[in-house]
Regions:
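C-terminal functional regions that serve as terminal interaction/effector modules
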Residues: 189-198, 214
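Long, low-complexity ectodomains and other extracytoplasmic segments of secretory-pathway proteins
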Residues: 1-36, 92-150, 154-155, 212-228
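Short, solvent-exposed loop/turn segments enriched in Ser/Thr/Gly
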Residues: 11-13, 22-29, 64-66, 75-88, ...
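Extended hydrophobic-aromatic, low-complexity segments
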Residues: 159-162, 199, 218
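Low-complexity, intrinsically disordered segments enriched in Ser/Thr together with acidic residues
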Residues: 65-74, 184, 188-192
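Surface-exposed binding patches on compact interaction domains or structured appendages
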Residues: 37-65, 156-185
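Beta-strand-rich interaction surfaces with strong enrichment in secreted/lumenal proteins
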Residues: 18, 55-60, 74-75, 137, ...
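Beta-strand-rich extracellular modules
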Residues: 73, 90-94, 193, 209-213
């Protein structure tokens, strides 16, 4: 339980549902340890409509451990690709929400390829990236740094970038073209902002949803930290 929120310790600092398909109801578990000297009731506040949570057991005695089981209802996700939110761990009865007890949530809904024709299946687009991980080092709070990735369609039909999103405000993205003919390429510019790095939890990364059936989801990780 490496992450601490008040007297409560958790095994994760973010809640992630990586590859969800429409109609699925995946679950994940957040392990909870009560290091306070009183009885604790684990509650997640401000749950979005597509998430539900149950604490097992409902109450934790002093020094006891338990878990919160979280279920994602994919039918209630608003769109394809990335949906993010924040939930808040209640540390005690009547707790308020704030930065200290915030837990970021992300869910990625994948496109459905079950209806594509045999012709499309045999001649798919294929995405190729010049890099899938960027090393940007340390940034001062007033500094920003940009890197460019080349995206190429090495497949047999038009490649569509259907969705392009960042997981948090530490990054910005610019994409020249959303549709690439076979053999064509384009530039994706990723910028890291030092001033926002201190505020965010989790790894800064970029998500792309494409119509390449073999690579419907691509995550670009950006290794960057703020100078203390």
């Amino acid at each position: 339980h490496p992450f601490q929120i008040g007297a409560i310790r958790l095994n994760k600092e973010e809640i992630e549902f990586e590859d969800a398909n429409k109609g699925d109801k995946p679950t994940m578990e957040l392990l909870v340890a009560n290091t306070s000297d009183r009885l604790y009731t684990p509650v997640l506040m401000h749950l979005p409509p597509y998430l539900s949570a149950v604490a097992i057991p409902e109450k934790l005695g002093r020094g006891r451990t338990g878990k919160i089981k979280i279920t994602l209802d994919t039918e209630k996700l608003p769109k394809l690709g990335l949906t993010t939110a924040s939930v808040y761990l209640s540390r005690f009865l009547g707790d308020k929400v704030g930065e200290e007890n915030e837990i970021p949530v992300s869910a990625v809904l994948l496109p459905d390829f079950s209806h594509i024709s045999q012709q499309e299946r045999l001649n798919p687009p294929a995405i190729h990236l010049s890099a899938e991980e960027l090393q940007m080092g340390e940034l001062e709070s007033d500094e920003k740094k940009a890197h460019t990735i080349i995206i190429k369609n090495v497949g047999k039909s038009n490649l569509e970038i259907r969705d392009l999103q960042v997981f948090n405000s530490a990054l910005g993205v610019q994409l020249k073209k959303r549709v690439l003919k076979p053999g064509a390429s384009t530039k994706l510019k990723i910028t890291a902002f030092g001033q926002n790095l201190k505020k965010v939890k989790g790894t800064p990364r970029v998500l792309m949803i494409t119509n390449d059936p073999n690579n419907p989801k691509i995550i670009i990780k950006v290794k960057v930290t703020s100078k203390k």
